[in-house]
Every structure is written in structure tokens, then in C-alpha cells.
Design a protein with these regions (language model features):
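N-terminal basic/disordered segments at the start of proteins
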Residues: 2-23
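Short, well-ordered coil/turn segments that N-cap beta-strands
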Residues: 10-12, 61-63, 85-87
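Active-site mouth loops of central-metabolism enzymes
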Residues: 35-47, 109
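Amphipathic, hydrophobic secondary-structure cores in small proteins
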Residues: 47-73
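Alpha-helix-loop-beta-strand connector modules within alpha/beta enzyme cores
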Residues: 73-96
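Short, charged, surface-exposed secondary-structure boundary motifs
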Residues: 97-103
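Long, charge-rich, low-complexity intrinsically disordered regions
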Residues: 23, 29-32, 42, 102
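Hydrophobic faces of well-ordered beta-strands that scaffold small-molecule active sites
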Residues: 14-16, 40-42, 67, 89-91
Length: 109
């Protein structure tokens, strides 16, 4: 069951997770806060780390997770499964990503 979010009572919390070899989710993170939104930006070295971060973001109370273009179809499915579909998971989508020598994250991670 999806979590209910009341925009008038809380700031809207969302997460943006990006993947790149060498990222450390414990140090490669930032919080961007505006009047109505808190966005957690977290870098992960692979899909496994991203699954752990997604679960952390669910516990933090995020209403949605956005994934960078490095996540292929398999990666998006893994993150959705990691949060047990309790919150929506969306993604910027590239069939192949120029930053990864025209490969999908599915081929790398």
C-alpha cells in the first residue's frame, strides 16, 4: 500500500539516486531544501547500494524516488522491489547513456 502524504502538514520529501562507479552513498550525498520540498541526492556505486539507499529513503519518509539515467530497466525494477512498491520509483531513461560509453547501467551494474 502506498504511503499517504499530506503536503500541508509536512514538507514533501523525495530522493534522487544516481549511480556511478566509485560513489560512496555514505559520503556522496546532499540534501536540498526549499520551502515545500526536501530532496535527498545520493550517489551509489552499483544497484546493490542503491537498493539499500532506497530502503533508507523509504524509512526517511520520502514520497517518491527518482533514478538517474544510469539505471536501466533492470535497475529500476530492483529499486521498485527494494521499496516493496510502497512509494513510486521513476527514472530518467536512456537506452544507452553517453557517460557510460553508450551502455545501459544494466550492462555495467
Amino acid at each position: 500500500m502506498a504511503r499517504k502524504f499530506k503536503l500541508n502538514e509536512d514538507k514533501f520529501k523525495v530522493a534522487f539516486i544516481f549511480a556511478n562507479e566509485g560513489c560512496n552513498p555514505k559520503k556522496d550525498r546532499s540534501i536540498i531544501e526549499s520551502e515545500k520540498i526536501i530532496m535527498y541526492v545520493v550517489g551509489c556505486a552499483d544497484y546493490s547500494q542503491a537498493e539499500t539507499v532506497a530502503q533508507e529513503m523509504l524509512e526517511e519518509g520520502c514520497a517518491a524516488i527518482d533514478l538517474c539515467g544510469a539505471f536501466g530497466n533492470e535497475g529500476v525494477a530492483r529499486i521498485s522491489k527494494a521499496v516493496d512498491r510502497q512509494i513510486p520509483v521513476g527514472a530518467v531513461h536512456f537506452d544507452f547513456h553517453p557517460a557510460f560509453r553508450d551502455k545501459s547501467g544494466d550492462e555495467i551494474y
